Amino acid sequence: MLTRLKAKSEGKLAKQLCRVVLDQFDKQYSKELGDSWSTVRDVLISPSLWQYAILFNRFNYPFELEKALHLRGYHTVLQGALPHYPKSMKCYLSRTPDRMPSERHQTGSLKKYYLLNAASLLPVLALELRDGEAVLDLCAAPGGKSVALLQCAYPGYLLCNEYDRPRGRWLRQTLESFIPQPLINVIKVSELDGREMGDAQPATFDKVLVDAPCSNDRSWLFSSDSQKAAYRIHQRKNLPVLQVELVRSAIKALRPGGLLVYSTCTLSKAENQDVISEVLTSDSNIVPVDISGIARTFSQDFTFAPTDQKCSLLVIPEKGKAWGPMYIAKLKKGMSTRKRQGEFCKPC
C-alpha cells in the first residue's frame, strides 16, 4: 500500500531555487546562525532531503497504514515522554526522506492522515491543551495545527481565525476533511483581522496559538516569481511590527492565567526572539514560561539551536532531521498587573 501511494508522489520535489531569496538568507543567517547556517542551508535548498511526518486522524484511524509504516521503519514521535503528551495524538516519522501523497478532499468522508513538517507539532504540544478549554487559533490556515490540536483534546470551544479569505476557504475544507460533525459544532471559523481579535473577544480564551505570518523560509526559497520574491524581501522588515501586534491582540483575548504560544517557520531573529523580547519588555503582566524541557525530550528527533531564552526554542533542519525551521515561544498572562520576574526569558 505504502509503495503504491509513494509512487504517486514522485516527481513533486522538482523545484527551482530563487537566487534573490537565497542571497538575502546567506547574508542574514550566516550572521545570526554562524557556522550552523551552512548545514541548515544544505537542507533548505535540497527538497530531496526534506522529510514529511504523518499525523494520524483519530476520528478515522488508518490501522492498515500503521502496519505498513512499521514495516518500513517509521517510528512515532516520543509518546509519553512529556507529562502532558496526549495519548490520542499519533504521528509517525521516518529518518530518511520519504513522502506520501496528500489525500483528496471528499465531501462527507474523513481523511485518515495529514502530512506536515513534524516540527509543527511542537507549538501544539507546548500549548498543553486539555478537554473543555476555550482555544483560539489566531492565524489558522491552512488548518494543520487546528487539526493537530483536535488530536490532543476535546476543547469546549475552538475558534479558528483566518483573515485572508482564500486561505479561510482552505481552512474550512481542512476542518471538514478531518473532524466529525459532532465536534464541528464546537468549532467556529472567523475571518477577523487578528490584530482586532483582542478587542472583539477580550479575556475569552484559556489558550491561544499565534502561528504568525512570517517569511516562510522553505517556501520563499522556491518562489517562482523573482520579482515577487524581491518585493517580499523588501517588505520583510514590516513583518515584526505585524507579529508584535498579533501577539498583543492575542494577549487581550486571553483570560488571566491563560497561556499563549507564538510560532513561526522562519529562522529570522527579528521575527522570533526580537518579537518576544519586545512583548516582554512592553507588558509587565506577561510571564515567560520555561519550555526547555521540550528540547531535552525531543532531541533524538529534532535539532535545536542554542538559545538563552528558556521560554523559546528554534528547530533547525539538518540531514536526517530535516524538520523546521520552527520557532516556538510560550507566555502566560498574569493574574494582575504586578511586575513580572524575568528570570526565564531575557530580552535579546
Swiss-Prot record:
Pfam families: Methyltr_RsmB-F (PF01189). Disulfide bonds: none annotated. Its main location: mitochondrion. It catalyses: cytidine(34) in mitochondrial tRNA + S-adenosyl-L-methionine = 5-methylcytidine(34) in mitochondrial tRNA + S-adenosyl-L-homocysteine + H(+). Its EC number is 2.1.1.-. The keyword RNA-binding applies. One of its GO terms (biological process) is tRNA wobble base cytosine methylation. InterPro entries: MeTrfase_RsmB-F_NOP2_cat (IPR049560), MeTrfase_RsmB-F_NOP2_dom (IPR001678), RCMT (IPR023267), SAM-dependent_MTases_sf (IPR029063). PROSITE patterns: SAM_MT_RSMB_NOP. GO terms for molecular function: tRNA (cytidine-5-)-methyltransferase activity; tRNA binding. It comes from the Eukaryota. One of its GO terms (cellular component) is mitochondrion. It is found in: Mitochondrion matrix. The active site is at 265 (nucleophile). Keywords: Methyltransferase, Mitochondrion, RNA-binding, S-adenosyl-L-methionine, Transferase, tRNA-binding. S-adenosyl-L-methionine binds at residues 139-145, 162, 193, 211. It is an enzyme of class 2 (transferase). Belongs to the class I-like SAM-binding methyltransferase superfamily. RsmB/NOP family. Mitochondrial tRNA methyltransferase that mediates methylation of cytosine to 5-methylcytosine (m5C) at position 34 of mt-tRNA(Met). mt-tRNA(Met) methylation at cytosine(34) takes place at the wobble position of the anticodon and initiates the formation of 5-formylcytosine (f(5)c) at this position. mt-tRNA(Met) containing the f(5)c modification at the wobble position enables recognition of the AUA codon in addition to the AUG codon, expanding codon recognition in mitochondrial translation. This is tRNA (cytosine(34)-C(5))-methyltransferase, mitochondrial. It comes from Mus musculus (Mouse). The lineage of its organism: Eukaryota, Metazoa, Chordata, Craniata, Vertebrata.
